[in-house]
């Protein structure tokens, strides 16, 4: 009888531990990392969270790496996965994009930084199977990009929107068809080409906001400047055709390297934008204007049904994000930079509370 009681107690304790380690308490990353590509997916009852590449706390070019960490919800800690391959034989990338589709993770683009400070956009992209932990190389992006937005549609298509390509921004919407494994061009992004923008998609509706444009002048050198603008795109019967509309900006002040995600509030689709900085910056967190950048705490919520912005309470400030994840209906950022440009190992919970 005593043995049965002990056995039952152990089972109850284990069950309670698994619950505690679900969405309520996600473990920190094995090490601080920022500008990392993140995604999550659920397969046969197990949820996987992955962090691809990024930059470490030193924030120098030598701190950029190819490390991959994966956490299985309900388990302790993270596992080290094989590093992301590189056809260019670089030691790491930042500003890559990652999504989950058809029980796999996909990682696209990003850039490496050489010892002399020069940057190179990565041409190769990969699919990672979280079960076998094997990479499959995809066909190269027609125009390689970093600091772009990646969105999935109909569990088949992936859109790579705008971003930087070696020498300048592009206005392209490059579509990858996971059925045919081919790339094609969708209706181009209608605004100024930007990098470091954020976006999310619900159904056939996508929303892209902000980023940094390269502006040209007659009396001075070109300069990187924030671009406060939001564009709503609706995909038609043809997945390559997007009807774009300019919509009102929620504040009139752009944020750089924030992240966005689709979630539901009271059963309605909402596109939520979190984090970023109002002072665009280099990969070390120092602004292009020479001033240290600080993360923003504002939360923007766009109602897809009502086609308008809703007010929400602030959240924990964090910047240098590539994307967000949703676990058990709760939104988290993974890594990034917090106050003082400190690279973080934390998975920060961002409750969405409408005002």
Question: Model-found features: residue ranges?
Answer:
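Bacterial N-terminal signal peptides that target proteins for export
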Residues: 2-13
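Hydrophobic h-region of N-terminal signal peptides that target proteins for export
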Residues: 12-22
């Amino acid at each position: 009888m005593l043995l049965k009681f002990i056995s039952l107690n152990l089972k109850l304790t284990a069950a309670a531990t698994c619950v505690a380690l679900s969405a309520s308490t996600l473990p920190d990353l094995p090490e601080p990392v920022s500008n990392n590509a993140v995604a999550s997916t659920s397969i046969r009852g197990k949820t996987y969270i992955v962090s691809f590449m990024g930059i470490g706390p030193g924030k120098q070019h030598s701190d950029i790496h190819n490390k991959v960490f994966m956490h299985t919800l309900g388990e302790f800690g993270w596992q080290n996965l094989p590093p992301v391959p590189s056809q260019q034989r670089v030691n790491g990338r930042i500003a890559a994009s990652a999504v989950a589709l058809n029980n796999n993770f996909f990682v696209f683009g990003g850039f490496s930084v050489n010892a002399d400070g020069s940057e190179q956009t990565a041409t190769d992209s990969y699919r990672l199977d979280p079960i076998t932990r094997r990479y499959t190389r995809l066909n190269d992006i027609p125009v390689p990009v970093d600091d772009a937005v990646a969105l999935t549609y109909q569990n088949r298509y992936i859109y790579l929107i705008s971003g930087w390509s070696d020498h300048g921004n592009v206005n392209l919407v490059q579509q990858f068809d996971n059925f045919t494994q081919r790339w094609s061009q969708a209706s181009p992004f209608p605004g100024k080409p930007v990098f470091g923008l954020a976006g999310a998609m619900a159904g056939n509706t996508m929303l892209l906001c902000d980023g940094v444009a390269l502006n040209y002048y007659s009396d001075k050198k070109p300069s990187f400047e924030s671009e406060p603008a939001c564009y709503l795109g609706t995909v038609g019967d043809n997945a390559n055709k997007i009807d774009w509309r300019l919509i009102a900006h929620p504040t009139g002040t752009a944020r750089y390297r924030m992240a966005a995600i689709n979630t539901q509030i009271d059963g309605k689709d909402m596109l939520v934008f979190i984090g970023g900085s109002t002072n665009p910056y280099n990969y070390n967190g120092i602004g292009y204007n020479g001033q240290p950048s600080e993360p923003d705490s504002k939360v923007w919520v766009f109602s897809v049904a009502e086609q308008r912005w809703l007010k929400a309470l602030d959240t924990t400030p964090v910047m240098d994000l590539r994307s967000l994840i949703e676990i058990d209906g709760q939104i988290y950022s993974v890594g990034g930079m917090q106050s003082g440009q400190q690279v973080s190992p934390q998975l920060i919970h961002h409750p969405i509370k409408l005002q």
